[in-house]
Amino acid sequence: MAGRKGGRAKRRKVCYFTANGITHIDYKDVDLLKKFISERGKILPRRVTGTSAKYQRKLTVAIKRARQMALLPYVADE
């Protein structure tokens, strides 16, 4: 098996919330929450977004609350 050849150097992902100084994630801020949801409506994992564990937990709670209040869909339309 050959190793990886060429390609780009891996860039470290930075947490969006710590970089922008956001301490509170509001479930009513739908535009912000949509950045962390896939086109199918699923919550994107930390390894994709680069969000820290602390803010990933807060983000998950906010997305679930927004879904409960019908601000975000549970599944995306096809």
UniProtKB/Swiss-Prot annotation:
Gene3D superfamilies tied to this protein: Ribosomal protein S18
Assigned keywords, A-Z: Ribonucleoprotein, Ribosomal protein, RNA-binding, rRNA-binding
CC terms in the record's Gene Ontology section: cytosolic small ribosomal subunit
GO biological process: translation
SUPFAM superfamilies recorded: Ribosomal protein S18
A matching Pfam family: Ribosomal_S18
Function: Binds as a heterodimer with protein bS6 to the central domain of the 16S rRNA, where it helps stabilize the platform of the 30S subunit.
Entry's family note: Belongs to the bacterial ribosomal protein bS18 family.
Record-given protein name: Small ribosomal subunit protein bS18
Naturally occurring in which organism (per UniProt): Geobacillus sp. (strain WCH70)
Organism lineage: Bacteria, Bacillati, Bacillota, Bacilli, Bacillales
Encoding gene per record: rpsR
